[in-house]
């Protein structure tokens, strides 16, 4: 779902393109939610060898209902006509990523690797674990996120949910104005931690 959301010289490589054998043994399952901003519409597609595709169709047909017709048409239109829109969105996300990365890494105790794709960063905030604020200890990413939500009114996601207990997931999908405001609030909240 992130194959179109790559920055700079980074390229998405589908495993099926590596060799004929890989092609014959690869199942691609993809969705429209990220690259085409169709989150919540729950529409996607699969590509696989014919025998597997028939099995997938049978499973899907017995576990979920079909997507609403207008959503199916919207997905087709997105795949056929939205390359320029996606390219614009990627450029905007790159600007927001760069700004968010620079702001986060300038904050006391936060380290972060930059990313070549997607629309979120996963900074390491473990510097704050074991520290206290308002009489409460920050023990983990859940406590850290709760504090930031309560104090700064900024929603971030515990990294533990992504097998990264030292980190938090920070999305940069909002407008630049909102990102600036959120990071300003977050920085002020971090300054209060002892």
Predicted regions and their residues:
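PLP-dependent class I/II
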Residues: 1-194
